[in-house]
């Protein structure tokens, strides 16, 4: 089995994704990319106490900004962590094919989690994907366009997984 490949029984355990939710902009430019690997990034513009775990695996020293895409599954199911990790890895592998070695970022996709602390005793975790970029004009028209294209590609991959793996 190729690196990053999963067995058909493991693929069957990934919940069906029926919709990739439109991107949510996350301004991380004041945070180093290294810190984005496993530390929650707080979000101050939210009604609840919200933070993001973006798990960016980029080796670029440049600041980045990100978009969170929720993955809507069946009403009775939730996206699993290994499912989101698999989808992110697959997206990066598809993107890497045909790219030159000197391009800025080879891993713009990662498994991400929204952490909503609804009260002291309960945190809601929403699993999804992060798409990050290093463009100079963060959240410009071109940047948003790239994010929506990324979302469309995620939706196509999720459709393929639904059709051929379940």
Curated annotation (Swiss-Prot):
Gene Ontology BP terms: viral life cycle
InterPro entries (UniProt xref): Herpes_UL55
Subcellular location: Virion tegument; Host nucleus matrix
Any one of the GO CC terms: host cell nuclear matrix
Keywords, in A-Z order: Host nucleus, Virion, Virion tegument
Similarity field: Belongs to the alphaherpesvirinae HHV-1 UL55 family.
This protein's name: Tegument protein UL55 homolog
């Amino acid at each position: 089995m190729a690196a990053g490949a999963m067995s058909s029984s493991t693929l069957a355990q990934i919940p069906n994704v029926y919709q990739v939710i439109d991107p949510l902009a996350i301004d991380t430019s004041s945070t180093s990319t290294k810190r984005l690997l496993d530390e929650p990034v707080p979000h101050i513009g939210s009604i609840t106490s919200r933070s993001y775990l973006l798990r960016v695996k980029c080796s670029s020293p440049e600041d980045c900004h990100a978009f969170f895409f929720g993955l809507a599954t069946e009403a009775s199911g939730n996206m699993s962590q290994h499912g989101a990790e698999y989808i992110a890895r697959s997206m990066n592998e598809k993107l890497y094919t045909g790219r030159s070695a000197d391009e800025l970022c080879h891993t713009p996709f990662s498994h991400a989690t929204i952490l909503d602390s609804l009260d002291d005793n309960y945190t809601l975790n929403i699993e999804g994907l992060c798409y990050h970029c290093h463009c100079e004009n963060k959240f410009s028209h071109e940047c948003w366009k790239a994010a929506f294209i990324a979302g469309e590609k995620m939706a196509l991959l999720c459709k393929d997984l639904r059709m051929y793996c379940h």
